[in-house]
């Protein structure tokens, strides 16, 4: 099924996404030299150039989901040099055939329908890139691991608690079976974000006070009238307007900054409360348009998060967050200036083109992990934690209640989709 990603790394028009996250924040007010400059050891250092990995063999890659992002990922895998696209699968037969032509895939290995991915897994692939509609990710990823096939998985990895838990179990099983399972988040791979995370976790901010984050989708997702089946909603970006298919905006888009915050701070919420509303006229899908969530961490630290999916010319920096300590503040974002200001561990860096460079790093890491036998699969557990955090916020805001993580897990609520009338 086509996957037109909700990340700022959306495949077909990356620059349009970037317009909403580009640029560094301008400094305001006069600051003394002492407040601007850190000790030599605290100044930002240029990231060392990555050592080129040796391409020891070509891996046969299967592409599940042939939308814009899927095609883009397959192209970057080919550009890397360690992969050849061996098979493709998409719900829509015409899409599978067309993309198969573009990628030079034998016609016998172009599969369609809901179960097309199963035939792909039997076609001789060694690895899969799953870029489909998120509702199907847990089932597809688990099937790949069961088949001994390495998994490169897009976000969001799941839309509900049972699916998220299944992803975690699949990651653990993959490690046991010497199978690589990598979740494609870009922000935590950036050298500046890694450095800020190291300093924050080392106490750079002092005792934590509060956290604030923003996740504004770059537009209101398309939401045409419903048909007799959901087939039409499995293409373009329409699935983003259906919570069961996408997880809602806080899960499908905001997860970038939520995951980034978990990576930087190493902290997880234990409860949340919030409010959400749908304000677009004549909604067809059930996604929310705006929501505000207050997360509570175990030690009482609060984290406020605001999200929206409206085309309204907003001027805030989407996918950004500030982490406020008692002696210093850190600011992180998907693109632009990032820093720690105050205290004794000042740092200023810049996140540049993480949309593409992060994916390239992940593809290289995926290949290296497979060929060098590294199967710790460390990205999976953080993805599970991030998704549970996003789902907790979604549910608390939708229900307008105080909800604990323990209650969310115990409830184990499953989202369902009516697949009646779809091609098997």
List the model feature ranges, each with a label.
Residues 295-299, 325:
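Active-site beta-strand termini and strand-to-loop segments that position acidic
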Residues 109-126, 130:
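A structured beta-alpha segment of the ubiquitous adenosine-cofactor-binding alpha/beta core
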Residues 126-127, 133, 138-188, 203:
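Beta-strand-loop-alpha-helix segment that lines the small-molecule cofactor/substrate pocket
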Residues 65, 176-182, 187-285, 293-295, ...:
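Predominantly a Rossmann-like dinucleotide-binding segment in NAD(P)-dependent oxidoreductases
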Residues 23-31, 35, 72, 252, ...:
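C-terminal helical cap and adjacent loop that interface with cofactors, partners, or active-site loops
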Residues 27, 31-103:
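N-terminal Rossmann-like dinucleotide-binding module
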Residues 1-15:
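N-terminal secretory signal peptides
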């Amino acid at each position: 099924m086509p996957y037109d990603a909700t990340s700022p790394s959306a495949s077909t028009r990356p620059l349009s996404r970037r317009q909403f996250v580009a640029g560094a924040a301008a400094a305001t007010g006069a600051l003394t030299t002492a407040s601007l400059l850190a000790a030599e050891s605290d100044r930002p250092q240029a990231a060392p150039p990555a050592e080129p990995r040796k391409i020891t063999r070509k891996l046969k890659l299967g592409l599940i989901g042939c939308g814009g992002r899927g095609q883009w990922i397959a192209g970057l895998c080919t550009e890397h040099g360690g992969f050849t696209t061996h098979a493709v699968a998409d719900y829509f037969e015409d899409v599978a055939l067309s993309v198969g032509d573009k990628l030079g895939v034998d016609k016998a290995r172009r599969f369609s329908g809901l179960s097309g991915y199963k035939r792909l897994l039997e076609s001789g692939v060694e690895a899969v890139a799953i870029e489909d509609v998120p509702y199907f990710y847990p089932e597809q990823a688990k099937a790949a691991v069961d088949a001994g096939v390495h998994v490169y998985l897009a976000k969001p990895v799941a839309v509900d608690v049972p699916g998220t838990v299944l992803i975690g179990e699949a990651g653990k099983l993959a490690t046991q079976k010497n199978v690589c399972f990598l979740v494609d988040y870009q922000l935590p791979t950036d050298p500046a974000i890694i450095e800020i995370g190291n300093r924050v976790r080392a106490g750079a901010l002092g005792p934590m006070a509060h956290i604030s984050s923003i996740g504004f989708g770059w537009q209101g997702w398309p939401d045409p009238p419903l048909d007799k089946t959901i087939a039409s909603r499995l293409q373009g970006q329409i699935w983003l307007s259906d919570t069961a298919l996408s997880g809602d905006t806080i899960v499908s888009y905001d997860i970038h900054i939520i995951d980034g915050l978990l990576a930087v701070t190493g902290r997880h919420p234990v409860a949340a409360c919030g409010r959400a509303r749908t304000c677009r006229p004549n909604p067809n899908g059930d996604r929310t348009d705006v929501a505000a969530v207050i997360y509570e961490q175990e030690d009482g630290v609060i984290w406020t998060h605001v999200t929206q999916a409206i085309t309204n010319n907003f001027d805030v920096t989407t996918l950004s967050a500030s982490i406020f300590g008692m002696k210093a503040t850190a600011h992180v974002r998907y693109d632009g200036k990032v820093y720690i200001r105050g205290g004794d561990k000042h740092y200023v860096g810049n996140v540049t083109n993480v949309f593409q460079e992060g994916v390239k790093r992940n593809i290289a890491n995926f290949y290296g992990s497979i060929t060098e036998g590294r199967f710790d699969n460390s990205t999976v557990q953080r993805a599970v934690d991030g998704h549970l955090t996003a789902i907790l916020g979604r549910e608390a805001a939708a229900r307008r209640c105080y909800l604990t993580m323990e209650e969310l897990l115990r409830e184990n609520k499953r989202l369902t989709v009516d697949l009646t009338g779809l091609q098997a």
